[in-house]
Amino acid sequence: MIGENVLRAARYPFLPEAREFISRNIDLSLEGLEKTGSETALKRAVERVKNALLLKEVKVTALDELNYVREMLSFPIAIILVSTLMNEYVRRIYALGESRGAYKRMLHESDETLLYIGEKLGVKGILDQENMMMVRVPTYLNLAYSFHAPHWKLVNRVVDNGHVLVNRMEYARLLQVEVNNYVYEKTLEPVPAGAVPENFKKAVNAISEVWNRLEADKPSYAPLRGREDTPPCISRIVKKMENGENASHFERLIVATFM
């Protein structure tokens, strides 16, 4: 019988217990991964990245969870593959895909599990008597900057004793931002080109081919004539960046893609 903790680690392989499980049982160095015969995990890692590129979401099925070692191992391997590719767009899309998939899965968790995930991610929440979740103001501000709907602004929130009240869906959205940031930052860690095993290089090439096909299939547009041709949503992000305000990873990706 597989324990719930192990299944949870497979479902959310960015959690510390997933990293601890893998590090206890598998040599995570590139040399070690090559020797462990990690072909099934490598195949799943490629699938993770392709899910992100093609579906904009990394899906994890019940069968994936049962293959918990493969599932946990596929996450750091996917990070290595994306890092090796050194493509900023792929980095951001992969981070978004992992975080979006995690968000959808978190919506089906109990309050207890959701709060546990938040605590492990450094986004601690407290359940109040009305089943609302309370998040410290600095933590909330650090994550909610990614959202621009009026109801996310602090002035429109209920604040109690240094905590912002959020419902479980909003709490999961905050966790999604944290997962996105974590995954993106991990893909920035350099991988020595000479240390990458041959089978990993083939996997990177497979991902690169998918990306190149997506780029080739993009419709071509005539060059913009001026600011008057820019959609309002793009103009708002550009103006924010020109004013020195912090644009989210996703906003910068949108601007770069459009321009």
In which residue ranges do the predicted regions lie?
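ATP/Mg2+-dependent ligation/transfer catalytic cores
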Residues: 1-2
